[in-house]
């Protein structure tokens, strides 16, 4: 049975998600939308926005992978250190 996440943690995670979403939306909008003379979204604005989002997602994925690799290395180092400390001399 999966453990339930406390409501306060769920709220915190949701607030973090909204903050990230808002920052990404603002960044891509400011980078991609330059002309307000029409109600229509121009093809180049759509393309720019898609590239902006893809770049952000790739960056986030890469950071997550590096973070995971770092933690694996730290755990291995701790395990090796614990193994050395546990051995008689």
UniProtKB/Swiss-Prot annotation:
The modification N-acetylalanine is found at residue 2. Disulfide bonds join 28-52, 32-48. GO terms for biological process: protein insertion into mitochondrial inner membrane; protein targeting to mitochondrion; sensory perception of sound. Pfam families: zf-Tim10_DDP (PF02953). A motif (Twin CX3C motif) lies at residues 28-52. The keyword Protease does not apply. Ubiquitous, with highest expression in heart, kidney, liver and skeletal muscle. Keywords: Acetylation, Chaperone, Disulfide bond, Membrane, Metal-binding, Mitochondrion, Mitochondrion inner membrane, Protein transport, Translocation, Transport, Zinc. One of its GO terms (cellular component) is TIM22 mitochondrial import inner membrane insertion complex. InterPro entries: Mito_inner_translocase_sub, Tim10-like, Tim10-like_dom_sf. Its main location: mitochondrion. It is found in: Mitochondrion inner membrane. It comes from the Eukaryota. It is a peripheral membrane protein. GO terms for molecular function: membrane insertase activity; protein homodimerization activity; protein-folding chaperone binding; zinc ion binding. Heterohexamer; composed of 3 copies of TIMM9 and 3 copies of TIMM10/TIM10A, named soluble 70 kDa complex. The complex forms a 6-bladed alpha-propeller structure and associates with the TIMM22 component of the TIM22 complex. Interacts with multi-pass transmembrane proteins in transit. Also forms a complex composed of TIMM9, TIMM10/TIM10A and FXC1/TIM10B. Mitochondrial intermembrane chaperone that participates in the import and insertion of multi-pass transmembrane proteins into the mitochondrial inner membrane. May also be required for the transfer of beta-barrel precursors from the TOM complex to the sorting and assembly machinery (SAM complex) of the outer membrane. Acts as a chaperone-like protein that protects the hydrophobic precursors from aggregation and guide them through the mitochondrial intermembrane space. The twin CX3C motif contains 4 conserved Cys residues that form 2 disulfide bonds in the mitochondrial intermembrane space. However, during the transit of TIMM9 from cytoplasm into mitochondrion, the Cys residues probably coordinate zinc, thereby preventing folding and allowing its transfer across mitochondrial outer membrane. Belongs to the small Tim family. This is Mitochondrial import inner membrane translocase subunit Tim9. It comes from Homo sapiens.
């Amino acid at each position: 049975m999966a453990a339930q996440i406390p409501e306060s943690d769920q709220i915190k995670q949701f607030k973090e998600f909204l903050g990230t979403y808002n920052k990404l939306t603002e960044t891509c909008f400011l980078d991609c939308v330059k002309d307000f003379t029409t109600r229509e979204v121009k093809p180049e604005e759509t393309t720019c926005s898609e590239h902006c989002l893809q770049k952000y997602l790739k960056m986030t994925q890469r950071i997550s992978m590096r973070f995971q690799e770092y933690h694996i290395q730290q755990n291995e180092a701790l395990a090796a250190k614990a193994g050395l400390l546990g051995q008689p001399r």
